[in-house]
């Protein structure tokens, strides 16, 4: 899957090397775009104790050492929102340069899952459709929302 350009979030905030002067490490994150048959998709808020707390995003989380994107997505969605997902389809990969981290986002479409949504980290959630009305949106989520408006609904690549 080809990575797109780097999005610089909050360019007015400083970045740079880590404490030893080395370039920042890239954090890989699996992101699930859960879509219902009616075209609505799930957004959750980031927990208040994390960077960008309260911002809306697609659910997901960091890959652990040795995990594939799909394995991480399955684990994170079970841990964070209490569901077990079916097939995950790779959609796109974006790099986002946040002031606190350099993040590679692996976006996957998920069309089926089992279990009831349970926000285990105190998040809020909403089923919404395009154009998105939730606000504020996490900067790394904005390009994907715009892209989703222009991609066919049946666009899938197996993860």
Functional labels for PLM-detected ranges:
Residues 10-13, 18-41, 62, 93:
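Conserved N-terminal beta-strand and adjoining loop/helix that marks the start
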Residues 109, 117-152:
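NUDIX/MutT-family hydrolases
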Residues 36-39, 47, 111-116, 130-132:
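Short loop segments at secondary-structure junctions
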Residues 33, 43, 105-109, 127:
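Conserved hydrophobic/aromatic beta-strand scaffold that supports enzyme active sites
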Residues 22-24, 149-159:
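Generic C-terminal helix-cap and adjacent flexible tail
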Residues 40-79:
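Conserved Nudix-box catalytic region and its N-terminal flanking loop in Nudix hydrolases
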